């Protein structure tokens, strides 16, 4: 189901096929198993299809980079660990396993799993002594970026806590890490600044002539991870490190402001700590 997807990955699959010494693809769907084998980018043996009693679905791709194409390959293991960990964070209750083959043909294995996704990840980052409890907000919205555009669906999830020992802000969209944020980052900055400022004003926390707080004051003790999904996405560029959807920014800002207002009312002791 590609309703909420980073893309169809057609170009990536094609590029991998043509830059591999070999590539094997195994697909299970609709009661059948399909196999394709490629060597140096060309299919060998055609498509093989057979019935199967297994009910599982999915695709397995196994390939080896072609050393005639990649004359110098040196990718640190930490890169693969980081990629799989991020995928585990935004895909709760799914196990990701990294197996690294050593020179003696033995394997080193690492498992990445977050039962509650971003909420567990925030708790992990904050450590044993966060300033406040981990909060998790989730919701669905539907709207459009412009009047002449079609409506699209948005899923929003945000987990956060406050800490006087660590800070972290991470944004994900359609399971992809947004290194440069974009719309979700703008929404978080606007909503947290607005609601904390409103709390300080309504509870007379400001000193006379004291300037209103800025997000820079807040982020130094904020641990927050957001994971959003949408059926239509506008990326800042082809690297897909930031999204620019106007509606996502607007609906996420409203979503956060509403939930933060309730959080401050229902948790007065934590609100005082934050202030």
Regions found by a protein language model. Give the residues of each.
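GHKL-family ATPase ATP-binding module
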Residues: 4-6, 10, 14-17, 22-275
